[in-house]
Amino acid sequence: MTLKDLEIGKTAVVTVVGGEGALRQHFLDMGVIPGVSVTVVKLAPMGDPMELRIHGYELTLRLADAEKILIDESSVTKSDGKREKNTKNVFKENAVTEHPGLGEGGRFHQKADEHPVPKGTVLTFALAGNQNCGKTTLFNQLTGSNQHVGNFPGVTVDSKNGQIRNHPDTLVTDLPGIYSMSPYSSEEIVTREFIIKQKPTGIINIVDATNIERNLYLTMQLLELDVPMVLALNMMDEMRGNGGSVRINKLESMLGIPVVPISAAKNEGITELINHAIHVAQYQEKPSRQDFCDENSHNGAVHRCLHAIMHLIEDHAVRAGIPVRFAASKLVEGDQLVEQALNLEQNEKEMIEHIIVQMEEERGIDRSAAIADMRFSFIQKLCDQTVIKPGESKEHERSRKIDAVLTGRYTALPMFAAIMALVFWLTFGVIGAGLQNVMEIGIDWLTQKTDAVMTLWQVNDVLHSLVIDGIFNGVGSVLSFLPIIVTLFLFLSLLEDSGYMARVAFVMDKPLRKIGLSGRSIVPMLVGFGCTVPGVMATRTLPSARDRKMTIMLTPFMSCTAKLPIYGFFTSVFFPKQSGLIMIGLYFLGIAMGILTAVISRKTMFHGEAVPFVMELPNYRLPGAKNVLQLMWDKAKDFLQRAFTVIFMASLVIWFLQTFGLHLSMVADSKDSILAAVAGAIAPIFAPLGFGDWRICTSLIAGFMAKESVVSTLSVLFGSTKTLLEVLSPLSAASLLVFCLLYTPCIAAISSIKRELGTKWAVGIVLFQCAVAWVAAFVVHLIGMAILALIE
């Protein structure tokens, strides 16, 4: 019987984990090991993937992958759908004993074990932990930085650095969230390469106390790296609030490192954590325990195997700069990257293989499963002695009730459509549009007053034109769209922080698979509605190069907020009564073009299937007001910086080129300017689309630098909407809107694509987007001309 055959609400014991390669290793690292109990919670609305409960947390798995996992049919029982409460752990001592201070208790901070680094050395820390465990929140508390804090696995897609507050000789690096040190995704490779090669003086390992079994799996692998380390036990407020507790001192002694209970969100325990982290790094107090094998389990088969390999490869590991215990574990798992780094001789490889095969025969399961089982067995023993699990937490109970609607069979897709429609309606029709009108009034008033004052003072004509036509008309026209952009980012942030984005990935996996993508691809594309740059960076959470390339190619089709000024400007001038409807239609057109591109690409460039959908579903959490407000401010600040740097400079350059002729003298008519001569050369390319005017062409070129520059350039070149109406018809405006929707993303987005995929892909995407935009705009223009001909 396979896991695929297990009915909803039933629990069974896993007997065999099938599959091969990195995917199977990922299953094992996620806790899907022989002997573990697994419960089927539900199926996605379209019947695939399934949601499982294992080790006390929720995991998603496709049916095709579940079919590779065998279960014991005789072990099938009915589950009540709630997390089990640990009632057997009743400790004599107080389970919430306060963590000992510096110099108190245990082996930690004893001079005999200290090897201090030279004074003045910058203490570098790697902040490592599972995805969605509060890692970036802790980073913000430690450093005062304000990184994006989300509730979706993989928010940190790049490492970020910062000094610990009030400790200038420190540097903390926030690494991508990972589940293990196996090379399944690029994030895991980045994290382990950083720790092994950069050799930080200390590791801060953050663990979610409400999901401690899952999180400690990574902890055990970090301990094998033999780097001074402190464990930050996060979300202890939730743990205690739900009736659970942890024996901190006992946990500390069993792991061999300091353990500090904290609440990153409430800034509790952070000072103590900093003190311990700095101390273990300053005095290089390495973990006192790395060997978690039970010598009595299965006659110590795994224990003897690992120690034999450690003895054999010790010299190689030292030369390669890889901790020997870590190297031995990875060799048993079949990690090719570690094997290559060790540069073993052929006879040594054969000896290692013989040792591993002997262990498999004694243990009764394969090598990778044996290592995973060794770790989870120790974690189970550890938790039995140190953790009192609460019953179903308030957060989990709330999540179950919300999921009944948001991921329900008949309600999930309608709710997703309704939520996105509400976001767009509030952004373009209510909140954002209302605030935009207020800002436009303010900018117009300031422009008129400045113009009047400069006229009264008889300011030089060139300077007058520069300030009014170049700066106010250019930058001011873009600034008025700030409220819409911030509003859209606000709603996207709320969806991400709450945990809903992960559910969208779960719900959309099957339809996305039809076009060759995984459900995880939906998140970079949704982020792309805010900005293409983080959308492209978010693809690093995808483990397959094929999926990353395909998702990056589609992300620019998701209309970013920088294009909103273009839509708002043209719809207000040419289609004032249908403004909101047309803008929403443009968004859906972009999605449709992305789907069409995906379908074609799947049959040409990207053959094969999307990677398996294995993802943890976090509990819903109310977004923190501070986090949301900070994100809004960051986006507003970023927009203002762009407005007064890139857009400001673009406006000045455009003003200069359209004000002066080839002999650098002011021209009476801009058609005699330098700009007209340059842009006129490419204008014929756009003539079939209905907007062959050189000024339009100039604005599109400026849009390559920053999409907001399209509007500022048009404002500078045309001066007034009346002039624009004389040049463009509503049909031409519609064609231009479609072109702006689909043509090449800005230079920042192209740079991020180049960083992820290389120069050839970046250039290819620019040319591809421009070609698609030209064809789509041409089709719109042809259809419009045909309709007008029929009407006449």
Residue spans of the language-model regions?
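Conserved C-terminal guanine-recognition region of P-loop GTPase G domains, centered on the G4
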Residues: H167, V190-V259, I566
